[in-house]
């Protein structure tokens, strides 16, 4: 069943009854995305919060010079969304591109709010998930300011070997905030 991974993900944070889980998962809909296709592009309004069942996504922005800067990756068993666009219903600054054929479960804002109203523990679930996401972002910011590009590169490939194996050097460089040529130099020296 496609919802098994979602159920496992949410129940590691908050306990739900079987009935609650059925109602929770019924509000998600499945979407398949082919490699290199976009789930969201800059300028669109993000109308979903997503959970990755299969595959991997790169979430990135395009700067004024046309460079792609990767903010994060979302692999199997990870959540993805543009929280600013989703919550405020404003155009997104983000692009979400599948790095391989992928499948996601999506929930729209209206249904998510209905879950909050129906099951107060859903708010607790998403609060816990938001706190974990903030911790992750804080660690990433600290690493970006505390470590050299070489240290960040080795930390990334050590922590996320499965994701790193799916990426081009240009995509890794965009995530690390360095030029592709500099990453090539780091790899040659290692």
Where does each model-flagged region fall?
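Cyclic nucleotide-binding regulatory module and flanking cytosolic helices
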Residues: 1-29
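Short, Lys/Arg-enriched N-terminal segment that forms or immediately precedes the first helix
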Residues: 6, 133-142
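His/acidic/aromatic-lined binding-pocket segments of jelly-roll/cupin-type domains
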Residues: 30-31, 47-52, 71-72, 175
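Glycine- and acidic-residue-biased ligand/ion/polar-headgroup-sensing regions
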Residues: 36, 47-59, 76-77
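Short phosphate-coordinating micro-motif centered on Lys-Gly-acidic
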Residues: 39-44
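Hydrophobic/aromatic-rich structural module bridging two neighboring secondary-structure elements via a short loop
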Residues: 63-70
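Cyclic-nucleotide recognition modules
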Residues: 70-127
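Phosphate-/nucleic-acid-contacting segments
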Residues: 147-190
């Amino acid at each position: 069943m496609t919802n098994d991974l979602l159920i496992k993900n949410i129940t590691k944070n908050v306990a739900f009854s079987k009935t609650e889980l059925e109602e929770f998962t019924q509000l998600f809909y499945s979407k398949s995305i082919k490699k290199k296709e976009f789930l969201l592009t800059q300028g669109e309004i993000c109308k979903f919060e997503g959970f990755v069942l299969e595959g991997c996504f790169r979430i990135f922005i395009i700067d004024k010079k046309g460079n792609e800067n990767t903010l994060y990756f979302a692999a199997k068993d990870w959540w993805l969304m543009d929280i600013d666009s989703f919550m405020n219903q404003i155009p997104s600054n983000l692009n979400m591109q599948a790095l391989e054929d992928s499948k996601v479960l999506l929930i729209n804002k209206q249904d998510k709010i209905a879950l909050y109203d129906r099951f107060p523990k859903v708010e607790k679930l998403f609060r816990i998930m938001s706190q974990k996401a903030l911790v992750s972002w804080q660690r990433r910011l600290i690493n970006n300011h505390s470590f050299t590009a070489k240290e960040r590169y080795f930390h990334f490939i050590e922590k996320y070997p499965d994701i790193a194996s799916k990426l081009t050097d240009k995509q890794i460089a965009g995530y690390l905030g360095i030029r592709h040529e500099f990453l090539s130099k780091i790899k040659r020296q290692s």
